[in-house]
Amino acid sequence: MTAAKIIDKAILLLGYDTLKNTGSISGFEQSALTALNTVYADVFYLCNKEGFQEITDASQPVNMPENVVFDIMPYGVAAFLASSQGDSDNQLFFSRIYNLKRKNILKEMTFEDKIPTV
């Protein structure tokens, strides 16, 4: 999925049009891209140790597992976009959803406890 599609899904979740409180599309798009990169970095390092590359263009694909891209990232982007728009009710609502969904990434990882042999 591309960055633009994640941003579009977040905007749809919020019920915004792209001009809400900004006066220009480019200002809103920059805020959206910043929000996306913040969330992308957050979930990237939950799944990987290194290799993060920031998204510089909304047409770029987001290389994360499908469940992260479709089910987690739009809620985080929505939370950060709401915050940038001064929409505290939506920011709180989507932050809670995002954090609950983000916890599932850690649950899916398996940790193996081994006692060393001597």
Regions flagged by a language model, labelled:
Residues 84-90:
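Charged, low-complexity interaction regions
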Residues 80-84, 101-108:
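Mid-sequence acidic-hydrophobic segments that form the walls
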Residues 71-83:
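Short, hydrophobic/amphipathic alpha-helical patches that form generic packing surfaces
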Residues 62-72:
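Structural motif
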Residues 1-62, 92, 96, 103-118:
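Conserved short "hinge" loops at termini or chain/domain junctions
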